[in-house]
Amino acid sequence: MIDEQTKIEFLKSMGCDKELHSGTTLLEHLIGTRDIVKERGGSEYLQDACLFHSVYGTQRFSHQSTSDREKVKSLIGEKAEELVYIFSMCPYPRTDKIKTMYRGQIQEDLLAMDGANEDEQLITSEVRLNTKLGKLFQQHLN
């Protein structure tokens, strides 16, 4: 079992802590997506898949190639890595494509990843908006 810090260090080595994503860093987004699936009772392999879900890049983010697949498998396991690979290759928006192209547990896992990914971005956007509104309100009071 690979510890959390080793996984985070690998993501940092790929620049995830420097790349911006939805007003935070990509690393913060990946951790947030993983945390949502964890809170929802997702399995450990699904949590790992969420933590790494953009490691190969997506339609919106060209991050890395799939040349690190063996390294990623060694960190999160084959089942989680397969989900990461499929997720990264699935064009956005994903939900309908996942429902059409996959069945069974893979479909359930991909839909859970997609939902957590979208929810994390929504939560981050709401926090940023509330922070901005709070600052505007404070300025108005002063």
Predicted stretch roles:
Residues 1-142:
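Metal-dependent phosphohydrolase cores
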